[in-house]
């Protein structure tokens, strides 16, 4: 519970992209990302290593890879526009970076939705120190 309180305090000042990604996931899955995905398995949240533990963790791995390809962008900082139409996420205009970041986030949100059935509560708050296998290539 203390961790949730700390995260809430830290996120009060968060604006832009990371908050947008949170909203996108919440709209797609109906789940609160801060408690559902932030500390999930080996790749969800900051950093990642080892072999993804399941399909949900693989969504995070692929998302990290997607961000990794955007070398000229600031995926965690750039603000983009998107809307939801008939349950579809539609990335809006903006710069090429903003569009690409939005598409990475959209793919992750859809992946989480498609893999809700694989979500394993045992991987929530999983210690990254247990992720010791060699990481797959993107």
From Swiss-Prot:
InterPro entries: PLipase_A2, PLipase_A2_Asp_AS, PLipase_A2_dom, PLipase_A2_dom_sf, PLipase_A2_His_AS. Disulfide bonds join 42-131, 44-60, 59-111, 65-138, 66-104, 73-97, 91-102. Expressed by the venom gland. GO terms for biological process: arachidonate secretion; lipid catabolic process; negative regulation of T cell proliferation; phospholipid metabolic process. Residues 1-16 form the signal peptide. Its cofactor is Ca(2+). The active site is at 63, 105. Keywords: Calcium, Disulfide bond, Hemostasis impairing toxin, Hydrolase, Lipid degradation, Lipid metabolism, Metal-binding, Platelet aggregation inhibiting toxin, Secreted, Signal, Toxin. GO terms for cellular component: extracellular region. The keyword rRNA-binding does not apply. It holds the Pfam family Phospholip_A2_1. Gene3D superfamilies: Phospholipase A2 domain (1.20.90.10). Its EC number is 3.1.1.4. One of its GO terms (molecular function) is phospholipid binding. It is found in: Secreted. Ca(2+) binds at residues 43, 45, 47, 64. It catalyses: a 1,2-diacyl-sn-glycero-3-phosphocholine + H2O = a 1-acyl-sn-glycero-3-phosphocholine + a fatty acid + H(+). Belongs to the phospholipase A2 family. Group II subfamily. D49 sub-subfamily. Snake venom phospholipase A2 (PLA2) that displays edema-inducing activities, exhibits indirect hemolytic activity, and inhibits ADP-induced platelet aggregation. PLA2 catalyzes the calcium-dependent hydrolysis of the 2-acyl groups in 3-sn-phosphoglycerides. Monomer. This is Acidic phospholipase A2 jerdoxin. It comes from Protobothrops jerdonii (Jerdon's pitviper). The lineage of its organism: Eukaryota, Metazoa, Chordata, Craniata, Vertebrata.
């Amino acid at each position: 519970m203390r961790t949730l309180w700390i995260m809430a305090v830290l996120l009060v000042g968060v604006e832009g992209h990371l908050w947008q990604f949170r909203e996108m996931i919440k709209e797609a899955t109906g789940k609160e990302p801060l408690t559902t995905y932030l500390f999930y398995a080996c790749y969800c949240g900051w950093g990642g290593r080892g072999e993804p533990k399941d399909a949900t963790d693989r969504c995070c791995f692929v998302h990290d890879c997607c961000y990794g390809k955007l070398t000229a962008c600031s995926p965690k900082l750039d603000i983009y526009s998107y809307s939801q139409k008939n349950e579809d996420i539609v990335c809006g205009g903006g710069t090429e970076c903003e569009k690409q970041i939005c598409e990475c986030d959209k793919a992750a949100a859809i992946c989480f939705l498609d893999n809700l059935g694989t979500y394993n509560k045992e991987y929530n708050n999983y210690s990254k120190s247990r992720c010791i296998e060699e990481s797959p290539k993107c």
